[in-house]
UniProtKB/Swiss-Prot annotation:
One of its GO terms (cellular component) is cytosol. InterPro entries: Ribosomal_bS20, Ribosomal_bS20_sf. GO terms for biological process: translation. Gene3D superfamilies: Ribosomal protein S20 (1.20.58.110). This is Small ribosomal subunit protein bS20. GO terms for molecular function: small ribosomal subunit rRNA binding; structural constituent of ribosome. It comes from the Bacteria. Belongs to the bacterial ribosomal protein bS20 family. Residues 1-25, 62-85 are annotated as: Disordered. The gene is rpsT.
Amino acid sequence: MANIKSAIKRAKLSEERRAHNASIKSDMRSAVKTVEALVTNNDLENAKEAFKTASKKLDKAARKGLIHQNAASRQKSRLAKQVNA
């Protein structure tokens, strides 16, 4: 554990950011899984709506640096293929 006051503050901020980032990534993964589940159940109408939400969450995660931009694009592309198939 840090002894210097500024290092203690940085450690606290780091932990807060880690928790926040984990929350955003979890929401993103849940949105993707929702789309995949709807596609599996042939509920394409709701899958398209869920895809819009998942796409926004993937873009936001990429913008914040939680995942790489190419990874977000790849996931969106694969989801779009499933929804439009």
